[in-house]
């Protein structure tokens, strides 16, 4: 019976092994209680003891002991055992060094930090943030990662390029280094000028002719065409190039003459000259380029040919036809004819001054070349009549449609005697672009979308081809579609994308002339002698208050009450100078009011039309004599009467400036009121359809003005690069690829988008012939000297290293000067000159360069002190305005040489 009870006791103890209570851990101990005795040893874990009834129990009573190593202890009230130590009892939260973390925190390396599955995503001064996927810790906060970038221009206006990550982030995520230039201190100066090199002694007759072609009377184009830094790619790290046509005014005269294409580096040489890479003409000896043709730059290859990225050059010939060149040497010194079309355009399309464009009309990745209402295949140059036109190519001639539709009177894009100046846009936003040529909008395939029939005129047409108008595109109402802008025979037209008038804007608006002297008018009947002022049908004074130039215009006369003035039973007709066709329109927010205006240059005035300038009375700031006119300033352009203009906000103050050159001067007007901010009266031109352009032509992060000039004075003419003498002009894009430039029509590296973003829908655009005001308008570099140390030395020389960096927000090109000075222990000073950087300094980057100090004979050198100042030419001159120019200098500790005792 005792034996059975003993077995029963053992079974009970074993059964108790399922009890997890720390005070009743059922371990086998010494048997007892009578009956047969079974000796069970008590083998307890650290922190336990053997109870009287043979069980292992905690030494701390109701709670487990805290054991670590070979010792165990009991934790005090309010604490718990964690990893062998008694720590504060934080319930379900993490404990860190005696502190309870919040329920949103975890313990990392002894500190409470945000709960984060990836500790690498922790952020904030105290790691209180955990950045989500698609975010990064920047500037102490989590910033969303957006598009990839190399430069700030790759990002949206409210973003900047975080170079360490290579992505765009919101600008507010970091403290941005900025320099905001003072306004009102407008001081342009010529940075450099291009003129051709003299012909070599062994030059051919043609080479001698070409060397004498120094005048320019067309609109230059700018893009990166050369690999200047030798890295094997042509991109935004290289210096842009200027492409233009030059001719010989003295030998050939002014108009529609023979010329050659020049490819010139946009960088200014130290002596104020510019470097010519190449000179181009057609395949045959007589294939001269028209001296007033435009230049279009862009990649003509299909966009799936990833190995072909360098833009090509497109121009038109003097006597019809089109040509394209492609680069065959990385440095731009060699080009070959990619294709030559000797047929289109013909003299039915142009009599001089054709302005080609490049676009992908049908969004197939294969660009087209557009001249007026002619479309050529961009890859081959083939036209609609070529039997070997590739099946996948698009080509057409709007004149063919007119021939098939007698009386259609379809537009080409001419005004006065120059053109065509057409453009391309996706007006209805269906993903396919239209060709806008004068008064006709063509579908991508050459079919007619619509034609506006003119019923009025304000000028005679000075050319032998019909004047159907120059074009631009913008948005002047509340819808999302684009409106067509036409300047034609002294009148402005704005039409909806469907060809109907825009609500609230009349058709047409007359372009007024400017006050000034004019030849005596004649009257019909001839017996009429005026005794009171005469007016036209719109109530404008007739001569001499209204002047035009370039031929006769017959204007019926009215009195001040609007009644016809009669003589001998007939209404009096006043004959006066009458050609005032006016130049290609520029669309921009001239006055900073948030609405787009239109500028154009007539024969006698530059006029800005503002569609808020209406009502009775007219709003303040408007021209009080002419409804719809913001301002007008007299000019001098009776030769072509169709010069162009561009607009840019040089100071970034929200008020744009107008850049314009006529026969006798180059001027910059304030956009809000036409005040002349700068005038260069040494400028001279016979004028065609040319205009100055604004572009970062040398990739220095600042804008410049590129001005063509056919000035025949010995020290003038060619191409002039104007810049601000104080380096205050804000930055812009490095590209202006064609006359009909609208920013979104081309990427900064010269690629032609399949479906470009409609310019007028972009928050900072809605412009035409105006370069972009980029995000980070005031971004600036912050140059620092990071380190100075000795590399090597002996009795004859010291070799020292200087590390300079850019802690700012603006990338800067090579050539930043650092002035270096050595001072000996006895205070003798040696100027080692200014050392240029050899590569780009992007934000956060550094460059190390070496300087060698040759120790003069007899000089005791116990230790040298080297001082370095970055962005210093040694004479106090700086290349850049910085956000902090007080941290540019550094002085080393005495640099000793172990080899010199």
PLM ranges: what are they?
Residues 775-901:
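Extracellular/luminal regions of secreted and cell-surface proteins that mediate adhesion/ECM remodeling
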Residues 37-39, 90-91, 113-118, 145-146, ...:
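Low-complexity, Pro/Thr/Ser/Gly/Ala-rich linker/spacer regions in secreted
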Residues 1-7:
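Bacterial N-terminal signal peptides that target proteins for export
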Residues 147, 152, 163-780:
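Extracytoplasmic/lumenal domain signature
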Residues 9-56, 61-62, 68, 81-86, ...:
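Ser/Thr-rich, Pro/Gly/Ala-heavy low-complexity intrinsically disordered linkers and tails
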Residues 50, 56, 81, 86, ...:
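Fold-core signature of tandem repeat domains
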Residues 38-49, 65-77, 92-103, 118-134, ...:
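Disulfide-braced loops of extracellular cysteine-rich modules
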């Amino acid at each position: 019976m005792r034996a059975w009870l003993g077995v029963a006791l053992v079974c009970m103890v074993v059964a108790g092994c399922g009890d997890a209570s720390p005070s009743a851990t059922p371990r086998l101990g010494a048997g007892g209680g009578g009956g047969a005795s079974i000796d069970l040893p008590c083998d307890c874990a650290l922190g336990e003891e053997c109870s009287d009834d043979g069980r292992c129990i905690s030494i701390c009573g109701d709670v487990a002991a805290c054991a670590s190593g070979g010792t165990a202890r009991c934790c005090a009230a309010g604490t718990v055992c964690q990893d062998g130590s008694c720590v504060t009892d934080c319930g379900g939260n993490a404990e860190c060094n005696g502190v309870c973390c919040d329920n949103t925190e975890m313990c990392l390396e002894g500190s409470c930090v945000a709960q984060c599955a990836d500790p690498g995503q922790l952020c904030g001064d105290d790691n209180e943030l955990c950045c989500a996927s698609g975010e990064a810790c920047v500037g102490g906060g989590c910033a969303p990662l957006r598009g990839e970038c190399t430069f700030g221009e790759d990002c949206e206006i409210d973003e900047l390029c975080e170079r360490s990550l290579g992505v765009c982030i919101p600008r507010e995520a970091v403290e941005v280094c900025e320099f905001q230039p003072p306004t009102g201190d407008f001081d342009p100066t010529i940075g450099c000028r291009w003129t051709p090199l003299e012909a070599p002694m062994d030059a051919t007759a043609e080479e001698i002719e070409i060397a004498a072609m120094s005048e320019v009377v067309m609109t230059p184009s700018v893009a990166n065409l050369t690999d200047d830094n030798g890295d094997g790619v042509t991109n935004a790290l290289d210096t842009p190039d200027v492409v233009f046509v030059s001719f010989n005014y003295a030998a050939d005269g002014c108009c529609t003459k023979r010329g050659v294409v020049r490819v010139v580096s946009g960088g200014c040489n130290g002596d104020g000259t510019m470097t010519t890479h190449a000179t181009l003409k057609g395949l045959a000896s007589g294939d001269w380029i028209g001296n007033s043709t435009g230049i279009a730059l862009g990649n003509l290859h299909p966009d799936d040919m990833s190995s072909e990225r360098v833009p090509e050059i497109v121009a038109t010939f003097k006597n019809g036809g089109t040509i394209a060149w492609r680069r065959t040497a990385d440095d731009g010194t060699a080009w070959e004819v990619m294709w030559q079309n000797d047929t289109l355009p013909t003299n039915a399309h142009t009599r001089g001054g054709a302005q080609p464009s490049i676009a992908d009309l049908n969004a197939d990745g294969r660009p087209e070349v557009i001249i007026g209402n002619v479309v050529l295949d961009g890859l081959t140059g083939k036209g609609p009549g070529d039997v070997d036109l590739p099946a996948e190519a698009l080509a057409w001639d709007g004149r063919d449609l007119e021939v098939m539709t007698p009386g259609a009177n379809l537009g080409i894009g001419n005004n006065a005697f120059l053109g065509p100046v057409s453009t391309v846009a996706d007006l209805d936003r269906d993903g396919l672009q239209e060709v806008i040529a004068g008064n006709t909008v063509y579908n991508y395939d050459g079919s007619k979308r619509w034609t506006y029939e003119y019923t009025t005129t304000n000028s005679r047409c000075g050319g032998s081809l019909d004047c159907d108008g120059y074009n631009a595109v913008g948005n002047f109402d509340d819808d999302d579609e684009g409106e067509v802008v036409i300047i034609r025979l002294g009148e402005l037209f704005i039409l909806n994308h469907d060809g109907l008038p825009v609500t609230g804007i009349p058709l047409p608006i007359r372009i007024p002339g400017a006050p000034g002297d004019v030849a005596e008018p004649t009257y019909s009947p001839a017996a009429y002698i005026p005794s009171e002022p005469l007016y036209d049908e719109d109530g404008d004074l007739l001569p001499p208050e209204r002047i035009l130039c370039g031929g006769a215009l017959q204007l019926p006369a009215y009195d001040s009450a609007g009644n016809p003035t009669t003589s001998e039973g007939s209404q009096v007709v006043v004959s006066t100078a009458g050609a005032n066709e006016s130049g290609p329109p520029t669309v921009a927010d001239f006055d900073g009011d948030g609405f787009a205006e239109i500028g154009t240059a007539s024969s006698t005035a530059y006029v800005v039309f503002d569609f808020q300038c209406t009502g009775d009375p007219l709003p303040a700031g408007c021209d009080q004599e002419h409804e719809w006119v913001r301002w007008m300033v007299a000019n001098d352009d009776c030769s072509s009467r169709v010069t162009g203009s561009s607009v840019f906000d040089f100071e970034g103050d929200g008020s744009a400036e107008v850049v314009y050159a006529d026969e006798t001067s180059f001027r910059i007007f304030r956009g809000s009121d036409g005040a002349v901010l700068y005038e260069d009266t040494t400028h001279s031109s016979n004028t065609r359809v040319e205009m100055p352009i604004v572009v970062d032509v040398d990739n220095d992060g600042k804008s410049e003005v590129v001005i063509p000039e056919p000035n025949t004075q010995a020290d003038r003419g060619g191409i002039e690069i104007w810049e601000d003498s104080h380096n205050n002009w804000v930055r812009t894009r490095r590209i202006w690829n064609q006359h009909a430039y609208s920013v979104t029509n081309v990427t900064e590296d010269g690629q032609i988008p399949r479906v470009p973003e409609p310019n007028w829908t972009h928050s900072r655009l809605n412009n035409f012939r105006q370069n972009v005001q980029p995000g980070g308008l005031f971004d600036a570099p912050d140059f620092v000297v990071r380190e100075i140390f000795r590399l090597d030395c002996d009795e004859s020389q010291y070799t020292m290293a200087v590390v300079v960096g850019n802690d700012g927000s603006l990338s800067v090109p090579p050539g930043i000067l650092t002035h270096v000075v050595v001072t000996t222990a006895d205070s003798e000073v040696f100027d080692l000159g200014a050392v240029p950087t050899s590569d780009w300094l992007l934000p956060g980057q550094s460059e190390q360069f070496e300087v060698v100090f040759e120790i003069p004979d007899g000089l005791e050198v116990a230790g040298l002190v080297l001082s370095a100042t970055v962005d210093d030419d040694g004479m106090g001159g700086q290349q850049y305005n910085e956000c902090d120019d007080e941290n540019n200098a550094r002085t080393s500790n005495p640099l000793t040489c172990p080899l010199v005792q």
